[in-house]
Amino acid sequence: TKGIDAAIQIVGVDTAEGRRDEALRLGLADAAYAAIGEAVAAEHPDAALVCTAPLAHAAVIGELLDNDLPVFTELNLVSDGYRENMAKAAAKKLPLFLSSTMLYRRETQYIKQQVAEFGKPVHYIYHIGQYLPDWHPWENYKNFFVGNARTGGVREIFGTDLPCLLDAFGDVESVTVQKDTL
């Protein structure tokens, strides 16, 4: 927790006592609480990072904004609460930033630069797929967000990649899909 700046304190919130204990034991957090309100009252944080199950994002972001905290959130896989939370952040003049890390990576910027320098239309074939038991072997994929029809189905990868693809190549003109099951 101190790799960037020794003065930074990281406080975790998780309803699962075992996860809170593990975060403290591994030195991933300086303190851990069962509820956002409890953490805010005790620690008075400067900002919040949302790194939780996608279907919980809207409520968590809303509660953090209600506590007057700037929010950085990992990719949200559903649009639940987007408009409300954006309006709340704007009304409170609080930053609400959705992760777009891939847009800033060097390799992504390199691809964008090469496409621009080429100066002609380009053809790009995008292939994505994953075998969930291999991707996340430490727990059954049916027990976390990729096992849910609203938040699974490679959304977490495609949702991260799509802004980069659009930034480098422009608007999509056509789509072809091939699907198979093993």
Question: Model-predicted segments: where are they?
Answer:
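Short, conserved SAM-binding/catalytic segment
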Residues: E22-D30, N85-A90
